[in-house]
Amino acid sequence: MKKLFAIIGMLMLVAFSIQAQKTYALLAGVSNYGDPNINLSNTTKDVKRLNTIFKSQEFVTAMITSQNANHDNIVKKLQAIVRLAKPDDKIIFFFSGHGSPGGFVPSDRSFFNYQELVDILKKAKAKNVFCFIDACMSGSVKTISANNFGIGNNYPRICFMTSSDANELSRESSLVGNGFFTKALIKGLKGMSDKNTDKSITLGELYNYIYKDVVHRTSGSQNEMHPQLLCPDSMKGIVLTKF
């Protein structure tokens, strides 16, 4: 009987541990840069649609858009999440807006360097951090030393999935209602990327689906896009969503 109670107790502890794990997501999108010549159409939609998906997964989400998505606000929100997240939690950062070599552009038109982003995220106790960047030239994050992304048993392990390569523009489309990358990201998270049909979406499955979808939709156009994945191989099997 004691052995039975011990087994039940262990199962309850495991169940509680699984339930206690959280995913914190900060979603930032800039449509309005204060200039009609550079304003974007779908970035706020990108954020809102992703937020709906993440909330359905019971993620703890924070959403900042347009003028609120300035450099200082993004930093403050990220730092708050970094302080909250525990080792078994996950952190997700998503940005949709303009980009340039080495970083992305918040609403105040300042420059948010990818190295600065990594420096903030490296302070997290959470073991796994995921960044999804839908911005021009976002693949330029590859210029950051691989030592910044977690090697071997070093934590946190940081993943970047970007909409385009370092020398490519990222596009949005009124026909799909989102950026090409974010549209594929949304479809993938909702189940289209579940190659082995186990009702779970891993990072590797998600990237493979996004890459094929985006390349297919932009192939032959003036601005082809080739999404990039930069992360330790050990992260590719991590489950991001279930459906």
Q: Over which residues does each language-model region extend?
A:
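Cysteine endopeptidase catalytic domains of the caspase/legumain-like
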Residues: 16-243
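Sec-dependent N-terminal signal peptides
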Residues: 4-14
